[in-house]
Swiss-Prot record:
One annotated GO molecular function: structural constituent of ribosome
GO CC, any one term: cytoplasm
Keywords, sorted A to Z: Ribonucleoprotein, Ribosomal protein
Taxonomic source organism: Endomicrobium trichonymphae
Protein name per UniProt: Large ribosomal subunit protein bL33
Any GO BP annotation: translation
Family statement: Belongs to the bacterial ribosomal protein bL33 family.
HAMAP family listed in its UniProt record: Ribosomal_bL33
Length: 50
């Protein structure tokens, strides 16, 4: 079974870290989702950060 790691999703506009997820450590590539940013007040791209 793959080890899980905690990742943070940061807004690509204001760089505010809004969401936390866990995923398998052996996953390749960075996660990018369109989520709501409380700081910007709209849906923006959120990209994975450590």
């Amino acid at each position: 079974m793959a080890e899980r790691v905690i990742i943070t999703l940061a807004c690509s506009v204001c760089k505010n870290r809004n969401y936390y997820f866990d995923r398998a450590k052996n996953h390749e590539g960075k996660l990018a989702l369109k989520k709501f940013c409380k700081n910007c007040g709209k849906r923006t791209d959120h990209k994975e950060t450590k």
